[in-house]
């Protein structure tokens, strides 16, 4: 990861100014911190549970459960962070870093591919196929370097879009190569992914449209976040989203234990 990022920085540094490279690196860093934290937590919590389950049917159900919950958490986080990106950069880094916020809003879309990559990587790691895991990781790096070389003559925004496209192609490859081993087909994975992801996406657009009628500057992002959460929860309640209800039950149970 560090070597790959260094290659990106060198190539971008040769084509753009040092300030543009700084905005790119800062946007990437802001995307990486929350995304990797979520991925690490999910992998640490789910891997031993799934690996210790010997019944194939129960293991399949665990994969399905982890995939659904992971997708909901990640998609909600991604679109919430997109909603507050300007304010986050302004509050955490200062006004001079605001130009990095649009790059971050594109970069963070890469995180939407994490459920496919993490769950499918777990499938082959538990099966002990280290060669396939290594090849898929290498393919991911190659795809992103190719995307960078193709887009480097354009704008920084196009470079980041290229990285997002490469990440989605890589995620599709993970689903095609790994999921079929346990009957968790690519079609089924993306059907679940879309059925969950459209709600946070809709909540994001609704919150942005509502706030577009008001001029509140960076602080408007905070109201956008509130609208986003209200709309998302309302959509999930109206559609009786099973993943949302399950996560809500887990959260309420956890709070009750804390209050005892």
Model-derived regions: residue spans:
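Alpha-helical transmembrane segments of multi-pass membrane transport and lipid-handling proteins
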Residues: 63-114, 145-153, 201-204, 209-214
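Membrane-proximal transmembrane or re-entrant/amphipathic helices at the cytosolic face
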Residues: 184, 205-260
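Short, small-residue-biased leader/transition segments that mark boundaries at the very start
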Residues: 1-3
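Interfacial/gating helices of multi-pass transporter permease domains
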Residues: 11-32, 61-62, 98-104
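Alpha-helical transmembrane segments of polytopic membrane transporters and translocases
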Residues: 8-10, 22-39, 68-69, 110, ...
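Membrane-water interface segments that mark the loop-to-transmembrane alpha-helix transition
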Residues: 56-77, 136, 191-196
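Helix-loop junctions and terminal segments of transmembrane helices
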Residues: 27, 31-68, 121-126
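Short runs within selected transmembrane alpha-helices of multi-pass transporters and secretion channels
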Residues: 5, 28, 43, 102-148, ...
């Amino acid at each position: 990861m560090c070597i790959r990022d260094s290659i990106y920085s060198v190539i971008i540094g040769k084509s753009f100014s040092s300030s543009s490279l700084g905005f790119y690196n800062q946007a990437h860093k802001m995307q990486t911190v929350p995304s990797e934290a979520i991925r690490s937590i999910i992998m640490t919590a789910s891997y031993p549970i799934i690996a210790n389950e010997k019944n194939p049917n129960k293991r399949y159900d665990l994969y399905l459960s982890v995939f659904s919950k992971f997708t909901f958490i990640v998609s909600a986080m991604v679109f919430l962070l997109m909603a507050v990106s300007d304010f986050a950069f302004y509050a955490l880094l200062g006004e001079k870093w605001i130009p990095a916020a649009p790059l971050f809003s594109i970069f963070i879309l890469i995180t939407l591919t994490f459920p496919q990559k993490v769950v499918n990587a777990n499938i082959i790691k538990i099966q002990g196929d280290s060669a396939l895991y290594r090849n898929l990781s290498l393919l991911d790096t190659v795809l992103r370097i190719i995307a960078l070389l193709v887009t480097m003559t354009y704008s920084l925004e196009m470079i980041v879009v290229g990285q997002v496209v490469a990440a989605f192609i890589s995620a599709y490859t993970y689903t095609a190569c790994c999921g079929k081993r346990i009957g968790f087909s690519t079609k089924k994975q993306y059907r679940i992914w879309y059925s969950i992801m459209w709600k946070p996406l809709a909540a994001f657009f609704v919150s942005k449209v509502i706030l577009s009628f008001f001029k509140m500057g960076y602080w408007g992002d905070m109201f956008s976040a509130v609208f986003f959460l209200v709309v998302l929860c309302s959509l999930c309640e109206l559609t009786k989203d099973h993943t949302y209800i399950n996560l809500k039950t887990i959260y309420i149970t956890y709070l009750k234990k804390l209050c005892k």
